[in-house]
Amino acid sequence: MDLLLLLFSAIWYILPAYVANAVPCILGGGRPVDLGKNFFDGNRIIGNGVTYRGTFFGILFGIITGILQHFIVILYMDPQSVFNYGLTGYIILGFLLGTGALFGDMLGSFIKRRLKLNQGQSAPLLDQMTFIVFALIFAYPLYQQPVNLMVILLVISPIIHFSSNIIAYKLHLKKVWW
C-alpha cells in the first residue's frame, strides 16, 4: 500500500473519533460528568470541561460520521479502495470510535487533575494521544487494523490535533490555542 493511500485510509478509518472529540467543544456545556465532585486528593475528578451534553453529542456525531462515510463509499468511492463495512458496520464503528475517543479524553482530564493541571492547561501528548489510543482500543475487538495504519495514526494525530485546535481558537470556539 503506498504511503498516500495508507494516510488516507488511516484518516478515513479514525474520522468518527476526530469528529466525536471535536463536537463537545461546539455543542458541549451543561452538567459535568463528575457532577462537580472531588477525588480523594481534593481536586475535581474530571472537571467542568467534560459534560453529559458534550459526551452525548460527541458520540452521536461519531455515529453520524460513520453513517455519512457509508454513503460516501457507496456513492463516490470504489468500495475496494477503502474500508467497506456496510451501514451497520459503520454505525457500530462510529459508536466505538466516538465512545473510545471521549473515554480517552475523560481519562486524560482525570490524569491532568491528578497532576494538578487546571482545565485548559496544556499537557503535551496527553491532550493529543489519549483520545486516539482509546478510540483504537475500543474499536480493535471488531475492527482490527494493520500495525502500519495504527502507527500512522499515532504519528499524525498530534499534528492534526494541534492544527484543529489552532483553527478552533481562531474561530473563537476554544479559549486557548492548544
Swiss-Prot record:
UniProt-listed GO biological process terms: glycerophospholipid biosynthetic process
Primary enzyme class: transferase
Cofactor: Mg(2+)
EC number(s) on file: 2.7.7.67
Catalysed transformations (reactions): 2,3-bis-O-(geranylgeranyl)-sn-glycerol 1-phosphate + CTP + H(+) = CDP-2,3-bis-O-(geranylgeranyl)-sn-glycerol + diphosphate
Membrane topology (UniProt): Multi-pass membrane protein
Entry keyword annotation includes Transferase: yes
Disulfide partners: none
A single cellular component GO annotation: plasma membrane
Record localization: Cell membrane
Ranges that cross the membrane: 3-23, 56-76, 91-111, 123-143, 149-169
Pathway(s) where this gene product acts: Membrane lipid metabolism; glycerophospholipid metabolism
Keywords noted in UniProt: Cell membrane, Lipid biosynthesis, Lipid metabolism, Magnesium, Membrane, Phospholipid biosynthesis, Phospholipid metabolism, Transferase, Transmembrane, Transmembrane helix
Molecular function GO labels: CDP-2,3-bis-(O-geranylgeranyl)-sn-glycerol synthase activity
Keyword Secreted: no
Entry-linked PANTHER family: CDP-ARCHAEOL SYNTHASE
UniProt function note: Catalyzes the formation of CDP-2,3-bis-(O-geranylgeranyl)-sn-glycerol (CDP-archaeol) from 2,3-bis-(O-geranylgeranyl)-sn-glycerol 1-phosphate (DGGGP) and CTP. This reaction is the third ether-bond-formation step in the biosynthesis of archaeal membrane lipids.
Family: Belongs to the CDP-archaeol synthase family.
Protein name as annotated: CDP-archaeol synthase
Source organism of this protein record: Methanococcus maripaludis (strain C7 / ATCC BAA-1331)
